[in-house]
Amino acid sequence: MTFTASSSSCAITESPVVVALDYHERDKALAFVDKIDPRDCRLKVGKEMFTLFGPQLVRDLQQRGFDVFLDLKFHDIPNTTARAVAAAADLGVWMVNVHASGGARMMAAARDALAPFSKDAPLLIAVTVLTSMETSDLHDLGVTLSPAEHAERLARLTQQCGLDGVVCSAQEAVRFKQAFGAAFKLVTPGIRPAGSEAGDQRRIMTPEQALSAGVDYMVIGRPVTQSVDPAQTLKDINASLKREA
């Protein structure tokens, strides 16, 4: 079934699920999207797809009624990052992110760049520690903290800079909700329904566990995109989350 919208305005969804689109071909991506309902999820577009297909892909998804998380993890000097974030807002995305390790001045500049957009501004989220990273990876970079400790330090800086939330692992969610409050949004990759393979994520949880931990938005990729019936898979995930709630 194909779901279309008459304009670029996005459908309202209460689902916390964000489906990660990872396709090498635009037609295959849109064929998948046309099988699912924008009431059941939002969509994430990352570096590879945006580099291949550009802003028009985002517009194509919006025209089908979907909110789009533009996952480009901007990390540059403050002025360049601010301009990039403003460009994302001009595109009408629902969420955009930056690397918290870019520092306070960079994050503050990104935040200020969204002020002219007022209520139409996207959520501005910072990446703390990539979910693929382990303690040994941080040590290689000269960081002596554990991934959890380093993520909390960066999350605290993010909140101090006035951003909307962070990308973090589900294991950090309980502590972060307690430390930073319910309004501080937690976006978590590495979410996989029971029985799914871990893939290249090292710190993973099921959707039900993530919801219980305090995750606001959960990114799920291949368990949905490679499903024989992605629409039903999404409905099953959302039903399980409603039972958990």
UniProtKB/Swiss-Prot annotation:
In Pfam terms, one family for this protein is: OMPdecase
The annotated pathway is: Pyrimidine metabolism; UMP biosynthesis via de novo pathway; UMP from orotate: step 2/2
Q: Which family does the UniProt entry place this protein in?
A: Belongs to the OMP decarboxylase family. Type 1 subfamily.
PANTHER family for this protein? OROTIDINE 5'-PHOSPHATE DECARBOXYLASE
Under which name does UniProt file this protein? Orotidine 5'-phosphate decarboxylase
EC number in record: 4.1.1.23
Residue numbers annotated as active site: 73
List residues binding substrate.
22, 44, 71-80, 131, 192, 201, 221-222
Arranged from A to Z, the UniProt key words for this protein are: Decarboxylase, Lyase, Pyrimidine biosynthesis
Any idea what job this protein has?
A: Catalyzes the decarboxylation of orotidine 5'-monophosphate (OMP) to uridine 5'-monophosphate (UMP).
Q: Gene Ontology cellular component?
A: cytosol
Q: Which Gene3D superfamilies match?
A: Aldolase class I
Q: Which reaction does it catalyse?
A: orotidine 5'-phosphate + H(+) = UMP + CO2
Tell me which Gene Ontology terms the entry assigns under biological process.
'de novo' pyrimidine nucleobase biosynthetic process; 'de novo' UMP biosynthetic process
How is the quaternary structure described? Answer: Homodimer.
Determine if Cell cycle is one of this entry's keywords. Answer: no
Give a GO molecular function annotation for the protein.
orotidine-5'-phosphate decarboxylase activity
Do you know which InterPro entries this protein is assigned to? Answer: Aldolase_TIM, OMPdecase, OMPdecase_AS, OMPdecase_bac, OMPdeCOase_dom, RibuloseP-bd_barrel
